[in-house]
C-alpha cells in the first residue's frame, strides 16, 4: 500500500505526495507543498497538470520545480478536453518525466477507466523504476461521461444538491455587488 495525499495548494491547483508519513497542510504554495513532501521522503506526482477547466499549475509554476517532479499525469479521464492530456504527455516527453495516469474516480462508476500495469516494487525508488516501465491502458472518455460523473458526485446526493444551491446563491450575490 502507498500512503499518499492530494494536496490543494494556495493558488496552483493540486499536487500529490506519495509515500507520506504525515498529512500536509492545505493552502501552502506549490513550492512549499513540494518541500513538505520531500521533507517526508515522499514522491511528487503532478495530477491533471494542463486541465485549464480547473486551477492547475501552469508552465510558469512547473518549470521552476521540474527537478522535484517524480511523475506527471498524462491521462486523466475526468479532464473534459482531450488535448489537455495530450499536452501533459508532450510535456512529460520533452522534460523526460515519468508518465503516470489515474482514474481520479470520485464515484464508483469512474473506477477502471485507467489501468497502470507495473511490476512489483518495494519502496519509493523501486516504485519510480517500475512506473517508468509501466504500461498505461486507458478507456476513451467523452465530455458527456465526465459531466455525468461530475453531476453524480456533486448534485445527485442531498448534500451535493445543497452545496450546489449554496454555490449558486454565492455567485449571484457576488455578481450583484
Q: Where are the regions that the model predicts?
A:
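Charged catalytic cores and adjacent phosphate/nucleic-acid-binding surfaces used
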Residues: 2-3, 7-24, 32-35, 52-177
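Short beta-strand/loop segments at the ligand-binding rim of alpha/beta enzyme cores
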Residues: 39-45, 49
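Phosphate-handling active-site elements
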Residues: 27
